């Protein structure tokens, strides 16, 4: 897995829609993604799944070098989908059930994304899921 995620472009959309699962997603979350892509893929030029942002935790210097790299990689925050439409980014968080925690999570990702990409457009934020409750929506 590359540090910058799994990139799919407009040329990959047909293949992407036919997938049973998506990188680093559960079967249920993959179903949510598939339904969203079927309805919205024409709005975007690209999708990057599992885009890592943030610094991660400091690794133990006594561990093997590979373990240290994995510690940093695994502890960085993961934007489920970074979608692009020209230069405009959209951060997409995928949940089976959308909760207030999901909304806070995407705000954290926005902050980290802006910190790492200060020249980027202000990202649109989207949280997708199968269901939620009236207080969250």
Model-flagged regions — what are they?
Residues 1-137:
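Charged, terminal alpha-helix-loop-beta segments
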């Amino acid at each position: 897995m590359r540090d910058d995620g799994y990139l799919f472009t407009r040329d990959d959309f047909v293949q992407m829609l036919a997938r049973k699962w998506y990188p680093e997603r559960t079967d249920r979350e993959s179903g949510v993604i598939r339904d969203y892509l079927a309805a919205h893929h024409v709005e975007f030029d690209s999708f990057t799944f599992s885009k890592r942002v943030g610094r991660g935790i400091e690794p133990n210097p006594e561990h093997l070098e590979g373990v240290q790299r994995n510690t940093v990689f695994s502890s960085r925050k993961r934007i489920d989908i970074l979608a692009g439409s020209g230069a405009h980014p959209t951060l997409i968080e995928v949940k089976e059930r959308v909760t207030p925690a999901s909304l806070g999570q995407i705000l954290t990702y926005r902050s980290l994304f802006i910190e790492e990409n200060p020249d980027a457009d202000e990202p649109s934020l989207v949280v997708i899921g199968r269901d939620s409750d009236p207080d969250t929506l």
